[in-house]
């Protein structure tokens, strides 16, 4: 008494199920309309489908094609602007890196001058005084 298991995941089974459901719905609708007629109610008319003329269909297709073209153009424009932004960002980053390297070289040069020592180990005061004078000259509070 073992049941034969149906293979629910096969294409044939699904097609049979769809066909079975369609015939069941058609039979139920027919019975419903027959009962309505027997009880004296008016039977609803079948909906009339509008026939579309070719010009309106072609116009819709043309409109859709135009929309697709517009979307593609917009996408290309967005990509182009994004690439330009990335390029400008890279250029700014390179400038910033170059500027920081130049500042670091200047700091190293200045530090080397300020840490100079005589033969006996005493600090050389000339570069320190010159550095302080340069700072005063470059500061805008002391210049008029």
Curated annotation (Swiss-Prot):
Residues 47-76, 83-109, 131-144 have a biased composition (Basic and acidic residues). GO terms for biological process: rRNA processing. Residues 42-144 are annotated as: Disordered. InterPro entries: Fyv7/TAP26, Fyv7_fungi. Residues 110-120 have a biased composition (Basic residues). Involved in the processing of the 20S pre-rRNA. This is rRNA-processing protein FYV7. It comes from Kluyveromyces lactis (strain ATCC 8585 / CBS 2359 / DSM 70799 / NBRC 1267 / NRRL Y-1140 / WM37). The gene is FYV7.
């Amino acid at each position: 008494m073992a049941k034969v298991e149906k293979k629910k995941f096969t294409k044939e089974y699904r097609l049979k199920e769809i066909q079975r459901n369609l015939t069941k719905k058609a039979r139920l609708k027919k019975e419903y309309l027959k009962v309505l007629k027997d009880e004296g109610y008016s039977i609803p008319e079948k909906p009339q489908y509008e026939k579309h003329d070719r010009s309106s269909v072609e116009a819709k297709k043309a409109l859709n094609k135009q929309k697709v073209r517009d979307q593609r153009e917009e996408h290309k424009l967005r990509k182009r602007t994004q690439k330009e932004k990335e390029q400008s960002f890279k250029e700014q980053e390179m400038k910033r890196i170059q500027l920081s390297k130049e500042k670091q070289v200047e700091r190293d040069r200045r530090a080397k001058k300020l840490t100079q020592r005589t033969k006996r180990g005493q600090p050389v005061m000339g570069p320190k005084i010159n550095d302080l004078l340069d700072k005063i000259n470059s500061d805008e509070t002391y210049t008029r």
